[in-house]
Amino acid sequence: PLPAIVFGGRRAKPAPLVYQSKSWDNGVFVGPIMASETTAAATGAVGVVRRDPMAMRPFCGYHMGDYFAHWIEMGKKVKNPPKIFNVNWFRLDDEGHFLWPGFGENMRVLEWIVKRCEEKVGAVETPIGYVPDPKDINLEDSGVSEETLKELLTVDKETWKQEADGIEEFYKQFGDRLPKELSDELATLKANLNK
């Protein structure tokens, strides 16, 4: 069986280096809110958040709300659905430098994902999901300090409150075809951010 599904976006701030969803429905919520910030390689303004649900926007041949509902239903049909993770290799510091080296170093994060699926490591609960305990990411010879890793794994509630507002606005386009489970997950996220 498939143990994990990994989504990813390109965000300067909100998304941590990696986080695990709290449940299948929560993971399906994470997929549609995937976003990247436009770069100089794209036409238009730089730094604009562009949402691309599950990286399928250009490829989905039917209503995305129905596509999300299909994912929700899959989770009900599978006895042990895969764990869902989100990665963000592109987090920046306040000076605009990448905090994570990327490329082959990404294997360090994938190793944590595999260990989570095998129940060999724990995690720290946050309002958005589970992030690694910094001690569970092997930093040996990576050039990344423990302090930088902690910054990479930080979930800033105020930034995520703004993100939640953006998600709510994004979801409006799906109208009544947005699965209730995703609306419920958004409400839960907002409640978690206000604790």
What label would you give each PLM region?
Residues 1-195:
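Conserved NTP phosphate-binding and transfer environment spanning the P-loop NTPase/kinase superfamily
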